[in-house]
Amino acid sequence: MGTISANKLGGLALIAGPVVCLVFYFIQQLGVIGTDVDPADGNAVVAALTANSTLTTLTSIGVSIALIVLMHGIIRLAVESGDALSNLGMKFVFVGTVGWVISAGLTAAIGGDVNNGGLYGGASGINQFGGIVWSLGFLLVVLGISAKDYINQNVAYIVALVAVVSLVTGVVGGFESSTLQTMQMIGGICYIIFTLWSIWVGKDMMARD
């Protein structure tokens, strides 16, 4: 493993990162919080997190690690491309990832002690704004690399459009909490599409080594 190339590691990160993140995310959303709990209802979410404290902590750790792995892959994609737009975008991806990891840490803290329930508002806000910044960065990276001959431009434009949708849902959910549950559902669908594209791009990156 010590001699693995930058492209191979970056490709693996693009494949494994989003898949693992998706698995832990859905375990937390479906297995810990539940589909009937509105994320805007802080008391209900806190009750669900503390009732499943071990799983809350494990999924928060899993999501955090997977997001960092994914970030490495995206940064490698931007560095390999070398264009100005994706270079800017990876800064946004970095900040968005940091926000998500902080939010995951606060979520784990809530799960560990019901007295930390007051942190939920902060965790939710950081998560929401982290998603906005990350989506903007991902959009810039996708647009930046779309002109490269090893990237399918038409598919890249579709993914860029999905990133715009993700960005809009983040903004709408941030301004109007009553829409948060619906916006997060749409955002989850966007992330699934991101994951499929990331796997494709990751496989191609490994092949370019």
Label the predicted regions.
Residues G2-D209:
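Hydrophobic, aromatic-enriched alpha-helical segments typical of multi-pass transmembrane helices
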